[in-house]
């Protein structure tokens, strides 16, 4: 049986918390990774132990992940990320809607779609984009400059992954206006999203071409992985919403990042309180 470690982390992780989890998982030792993370060595990882650890950690705001011992970041070849509310702090379409004065209407649809309550993502996107008809195209730049920020740990995760030889893919059900700028800013290898139609400096309320939905996200990831010779167990994928589930299922290391309950329930790994760079603590140097 493969030896597993339990990596625990949170912004306020205490020695006492690490020791309690070590006892719960019958760890053979504790190695401090940083002041916010620890690796509990050679733990029990049967289903009952996993459930007990998950319940304990969730109730105390601690991220916990069972990982094979000796795992190295360089063993992976691809890092794939969603954009809105994963790589960045906002849902871009909601902020564009704010400029148009229809944020409440658009946000309601966005939230329902991300929770998985609206099964047809393409239709939900068309409904939301239609509400943006007549918005000046300059609103996109306004959102990018004033509202959009990288989520904590984004730059460290990406630069460390790139240094370890991973190729980085950004694939989003959002818009190319933002993904292309983030691709250039972070020197990503590839980025895909939907393109808003603009005529005479105004949004028309339409998306050009096919909608990049959950199925398309998974296809882009598989094609990118194939191009870079990555097997499924060499792929890290991160997302937060229901439209990320198929992409996450295509990865050996699927990560629900500050995600909706539906996504956390169906994903092997989760970061609920840590930054994006919390992923790095799962790998040994």
Question: How would you name each of these model-derived features?
Answer:
Residues 51, 139-285:
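C-terminal cap/substrate-recognition subdomain and adjoining C-terminal extension
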Residues 1-81:
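Non-catalytic pre-domain segments flanking phosphatase-related domains
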Residues 20, 48, 52, 105-108, ...:
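Exposed alpha-helical structural elements
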Residues 26-43, 63-74, 86-196, 215, ...:
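Alpha-helical substrate-recognition element adjacent to the catalytic core
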Residues 77-79, 111, 235:
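Residue-level marker of motif borders
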Residues 14-18, 136, 213:
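A diffuse structural propensity rather than consistent per-protein peaks
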Residues 77-92, 240-243, 248:
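Asp-based phosphoryl-transfer active-site loop
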Residues 11, 46, 85, 175, ...:
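Short beta->alpha junction loops/turns
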């Amino acid at each position: 049986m493969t030896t597993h470690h339990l990596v625990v982390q949170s912004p306020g992780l205490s020695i006492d918390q690490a020791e309690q989890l070590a006892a719960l998982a019958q760890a053979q030792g504790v190695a401090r990774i940083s002041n916010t993370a620890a690796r509990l060595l050679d733990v029990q990882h049967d289903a009952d132990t996993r459930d007990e650890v998950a319940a304990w950690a969730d109730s105390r705001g601690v991220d916990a992940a069972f990982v094979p011992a000796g795992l190295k970041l360089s063993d992976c070849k691809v890092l794939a990320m969603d954009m809105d509310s994963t790589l960045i702090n906002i849902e871009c379409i909601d902020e564009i809607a704010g400029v148009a004065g229809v944020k409440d209407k658009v946000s309601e649809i966005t939230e329902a779609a991300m929770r998985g309550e609206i099964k047809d993502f393409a239709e939900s996107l068309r409904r939301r984009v239609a509400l943006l008809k007549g918005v000046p195209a300059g609103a996109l730049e306004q959102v990018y400059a004033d509202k959009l920020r990288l989520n904590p740990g984004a730059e460290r995760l990406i630069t460390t992954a790139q240094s370890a030889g991973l190729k980085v893919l950004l694939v989003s059900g959002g818009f190319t206006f933002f993904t292309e700028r983030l691709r250039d800013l972070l020197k990503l290898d590839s980025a895909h999203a939907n393109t808003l139609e603009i005529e005479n400096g105004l949004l028309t309320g339409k998306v050009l071409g096919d909608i990049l939905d959950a199925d398309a996200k998974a296809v882009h990831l598989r094609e990118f992985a194939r191009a870079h010779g990555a097997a499924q167990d060499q792929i890290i994928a991160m997302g937060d919403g229901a439209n990320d589930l198929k992409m996450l299922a295509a990865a050996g290391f699927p990560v629900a990042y500050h995600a909706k309950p539906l996504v956390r329930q169906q994903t092997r790994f989760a970061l609920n309180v840590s930054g994006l760079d919390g992923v790095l603590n799962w790998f040994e140097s």
